[in-house]
Regions:
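Long, low-complexity, intrinsically disordered segments
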Residues: 276-289
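C-terminal amphipathic alpha-helical interaction region
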Residues: 265, 269-270
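C-terminal domain-closing interface element
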Residues: 1-6, 131, 251-263
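Generic detector of multi-pass transmembrane helix bundles and their immediately adjacent loops
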Residues: 1-49
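Cytosolic regulatory/linker segments at or just downstream of nucleotide-handling modules
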Residues: 231-256
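Divalent metal-dependent catalytic cores for phosphoryl transfer on phosphate-bearing substrates
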Residues: 41-214, 218, 223, 227-231
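Cytosol/matrix-facing juxtamembrane amphipathic
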Residues: 272-274
């Protein structure tokens, strides 16, 4: 009895040393990091509440998808909660945190806006290091955008260049370089990182859907996955196409569950009374606004 207790105590005491020496995080450590009382998560709730909510939704998507392909759900949940901590450096520059004070990007040129958006990766890695978060979380922070293009500001820059060319013949700015508007990477290199990479894009896009239905969600995810695959974002990841398909189906199910209150159901006159129909329509408009 005493030997068993001592052995257990020794194992628990040795875990931090093992994790530090081999740069691995056990499920026990990762599970502890899902506690919302972690200083970084508490800070995010106050300084970047939109990002905090986004991270919770990404965690739900990633955890369920991990279960569907035999990846580590605890790792996915923990890493998802911290993947966007770098946004706390300049929270107002990210859509989910912008309120009545407007969009600060309106005062920036596209290249500067892209630089600010991309900087949340570097800021996040630094915060993770300062708070001694496991190496795997730092990997996810670094990889969760891969080398994707910050499309909005790239297209904005191209449009401005085109307008200058039409107006002045000789534009006073260089033609936009696509590499300036791409994240530095690396691309996702392990299954859990790739799952969070997709979950991050899916949650942000689904939040903006004007109408929520099985068809609209499925079409949205199909476009996101197709775009990322054609862009070569999974070239360094061991995920198979079969696993990618399972992840996509898991995302569809989880997204529909998360957005359930916004789903517009077809009206069946035989089942719905006029008052019920009016109530459902009003609720759906209120939720979507």
């Amino acid at each position: 009895m005493v030997v068993g207790v001592l052995t257990g105590a020794l194992v628990l005491g040795a875990l931090p040393i093992i994790e530090y020496s081999f740069k691995v995080a056990t499920d026990a450590t990762l599970f502890e990091l899902t506690d919302f009382n972690h200083p970084l998560l508490r800070r995010m709730q106050v300084e970047a509440p939109g990002t905090y909510h986004h991270s919770l939704m990404v965690a739900n998507l990633a955890e369920n998808a991990a279960l569907s392909v035999g990846a580590n759900p605890t790792m996915c949940r923990a890493c998802s909660l911290f993947h966007d901590i770098g946004k706390m450096a300049q929270p107002d520059y990210f859509t989910e945190n912008q309120g009545e004070f407007g969009n600060p990007h309106n005062r920036q040129n596209p290249s500067m806006s892209a630089l600010i958006i991309k900087s949340h990766i570097k800021e996040g890695i630094e915060m993770a290091r300062e708070h001694a978060l496991p190496q795997v979380i730092r990997h996810v922070v670094r990889q969760h955008h891969g080398t994707t293009l910050v499309k909005y500001f790239y297209h904005q820059a191209k449009q401005r260049f085109k307008q200058d060319t039409l107006s002045y013949g000789e534009p006073d700015r260089d033609q936009p370089d696509e590499s300036t508007y791409r994240y530095d990477g690396p691309k996702p290199r392990f299954k859990e990182s790739a799952i969070i990479f997709f979950a991050d894009s899916v949650e942000a896009a689904a939040r903006s859907l004007p109408k929520v239905s099985h068809h609209s969600v499925e079409e949205l995810l199909e476009n996101i996955f197709k775009d990322r695959l054609e862009d070569g974002q999974l070239d360094e990841c061991p995920l198979t196409l079969e696993e990618v398909a399972k992840i996509k189906q898991s995302f569809i199910k989880t997204t529909l569950n998360m957005l359930h209150s916004r789903i517009e159901y077809p009206e069946d006159e035989n089942e719905l009374t006029p008052s019920t129909v009016r109530g459902n329509k009003g609720d759906s408009k209120q939720k979507a606004s």
